[in-house]
């Protein structure tokens, strides 16, 4: 059994916006607070700092984090560990009471819909964090369940990477003005760029094309992205460009890979992301990268049970490419991404900003050409909808740079973006007989010129989201405010055992980087092995053995046991096995 040890403080240097947001949060008398901050700015650090301070002021209070996806649950749990917070990312309403050595849990909006009653009890007087709160509107039942599950919470901190609207039903715990969510604190992309060292400037090579296709009604059509089309035909044009039956996408992948090769000369771990339409499309794109460039791309899709493991392995590697489908909007945390290719039919502004957010995260410690600004490139079809979204972000980028450079003229000011009328923000609706749709061909137009133009822009140092749990940012904010946080007391009394809480170097000490849940999983597996051996040695039934081990340890069930109790249960099992032998 591990001996208790002193509590070690966590030192964090907050960015100026985080410090300001924390002060505003502390002065907010209402239970609800909405913070909107651009992806990569450090929303997770802000939220966990706020939670740590609140739990320290309110001993016994639990913390509940609601994340968009299963993958993000584990990222939040690991990020919380840096603050001395133990959160269970595998909580289930069937587990019984939460063990007293856990500060709380991480769940998903989807899980809330099926476990709202259990969560209502767990979250009473709790501190609740909603990561990307707009996901509560993904399903009408989710919003209702969120309200039912968390209306008894003491504090509710909602996070979002971009301002959002509610055109159908209001999201619980969010105030609105003219259908627009009213943020209590907002930190935009332009502000983050102006602050330097927070996010990267992103450049948007927009590739035109000439597409030919047979529409579902049998009509043969041809158009470039400059031609004005209605929504239905525009979607068909985009689908044609993205199809690998044509040459538009392979040429764009060539351009993106060439840019990545250049980047990796000075940033060897830099990587690229392709956002695909579906699983088959993702596999085909990986095939193109393999055949044309000799690289083995990682494919991660939401329906792949091994997707999280693949992403974790890719994050720790220096592999050049990953191809994803919906997981890009679900918080894929890959800080080394510098290149992206938008090859999906999802054309809503929210999804676009989420996708751009995958390449904006600043990487400290880079050296060599481009290290001062760390530009990223996001390759796009020159679809008018995407053109408009990218132009708005580009204007934020240029505005922040003009502020930074005073009266100096922007070298690209004479080359304005062509902003066409949007074709609508609705997601692509497959309400056609798409089985009758077929691609004749697609070719890229002026791809070389577009990429060269954007490369020249970056050479001048100029430039343009669901967030991920991020690094607490120790020692990288020269203008920030340093805070010292002690791990808050556990709900069951006492403080975090340092022997179980310290996060060390995973390479030299893998155990020290494990979360409390991961340690417990190992101990549960060892307990299960001992129980199986006892069944063979004693002739007792499996349930009898388990119940006796629980009795000896003084627990009702394994899922309610603390880490110390699981260690004690294992010791009882080993002693019993020695006697039985």
What residue spans do the PLM features occupy?
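Interdomain helical connector at the RecA1-RecA2 junction of SF1/SF2 helicase-like NTPases
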Residues: 9, 168-269
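Conserved RecA-like P-loop NTPase helicase motor core
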Residues: 296-408
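SF2 helicase catalytic motif II
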Residues: 119-158, 162-164
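Conserved pre-motif I regulatory segment
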Residues: 2-36
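Conserved Walker A/P-loop ATP-binding site and its immediately adjacent core
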Residues: 44-54, 59-82, 277-280
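Long, largely alpha-helical accessory region at the distal end of helicase-like NTP-driven motors
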Residues: 242-244, 248-255, 259, 380-533, ...
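Walker A/P-loop
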Residues: 29-50, 275
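Conserved helix-turn-beta segment of the N-terminal RecA-like "Helicase ATP-binding" lobe
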Residues: 70-93, 288, 292
């Amino acid at each position: 059994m591990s001996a208790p040890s002193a509590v070690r403080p966590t030192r964090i240097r907050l960015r100026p916006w985080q410090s300001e947001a924390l002060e505003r949060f502390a002065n907010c008398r209402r239970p609800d607070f909405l913070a909107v901050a651009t992806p990569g700015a450090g929303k997770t650090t802000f939220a966990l700092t706020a939670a740590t301070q609140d739990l320290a002021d309110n001993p016994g209070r639990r913390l509940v984090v609601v994340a968009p996806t299963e993958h993000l649950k584990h990222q939040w749990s690991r990020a919380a560990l840096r603050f001395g917070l133990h959160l269970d990312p595998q909580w289930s309403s069937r587990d019984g009471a939460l063990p007293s050595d856990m500060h709380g849990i991480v769940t998903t909006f989807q899980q809330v819909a099926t476990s709202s009653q259990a969560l209502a009890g767990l979250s009473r007087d709790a501190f609740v964090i909603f990561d990307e709160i707009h996901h509560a509107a993904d399903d009408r039942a989710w919003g209702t369940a969120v309200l039912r599950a968390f209306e008894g919470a003491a504090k509710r901190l909602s996070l979002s990477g971009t301002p959002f609207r509610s055109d159908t039903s209001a999201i619980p715990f969010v105030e609105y003005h003219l259908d627009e969510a009213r943020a209590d604190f907002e930190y935009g992309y332009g502000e983050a760029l102006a602050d330097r060292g927070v996010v990267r400037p992103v450049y948007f090579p927009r590739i035109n094309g000439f597409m030919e296709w047979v529409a579902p009604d049998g009509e043969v059509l041809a158009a470039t992205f400059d031609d004005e089309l209605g929504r239905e035909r525009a979607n068909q044009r985009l689908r044609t460009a993205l199809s690998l039956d044509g040459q538009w996408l392979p040429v764009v992948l060539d351009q993106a890979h060439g840019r990545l090769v250049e980047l990796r000369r000075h940033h060897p771990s830099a990587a690229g992301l392709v956002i695909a339409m579906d699983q088959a499309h993702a596999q085909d794109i990986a095939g193109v990268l393999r055949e044309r460039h000799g690289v083995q791309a990682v494919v991660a899709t939401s329906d792949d049970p091994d997707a999280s493991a693949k992403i974790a392995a890719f994050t720790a590697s220096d592999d050049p490419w990953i191809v994803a489908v919906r997981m890009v909007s679900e918080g894929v945390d890959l800080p080394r991404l510098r290149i992206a290719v938008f090859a999906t039919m999802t054309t809503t502004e929210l999804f676009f900003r989420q996708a751009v957010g995958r390449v904006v995260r600043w990487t400290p410690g880079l050296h060599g050409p481009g290290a001062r600004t760390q530009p990223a490139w996001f390759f796009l079809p020159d679809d008018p909808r995407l053109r408009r979204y990218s132009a708005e972000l580009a204007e934020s980028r240029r505005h922040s740079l003009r502020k930074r450079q005073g009266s100096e003229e922007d070298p690209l000011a004479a080359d304005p973006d062509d902003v066409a009328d949007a074709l609508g923000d609705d997601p692509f609706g497959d309400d056609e007989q798409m089985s009758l749709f077929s691609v004749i061909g697609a070719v890229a137009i002026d791809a070389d010129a577009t990429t060269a133009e954007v490369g020249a822009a970056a050479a001048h140092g100029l430039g343009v989201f669901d967030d991920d749990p991020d690094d607490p940012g120790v020692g990288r904010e020269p203008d920030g405010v340093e805070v010292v946080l002690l791990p808050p007391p556990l709900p069951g009394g006492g403080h975090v055992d340092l022997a179980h809480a310290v996060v060390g170097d995973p390479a030299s000490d893998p155990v020290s980087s494990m979360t409390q849940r991961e340690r417990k999983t190992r101990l549960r597996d060892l307990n299960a092995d001992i129980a199986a051996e006892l069944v063979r040695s004693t002739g007792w039934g499996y349930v009898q053995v388990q119940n006796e081990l629980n009795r000896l340890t003084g627990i009702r069930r394994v899922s309610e046991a603390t880490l110390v109790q699981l260690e004690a249960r294992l010791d009882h099992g080993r002693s019993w096995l020695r006697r039985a032998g």
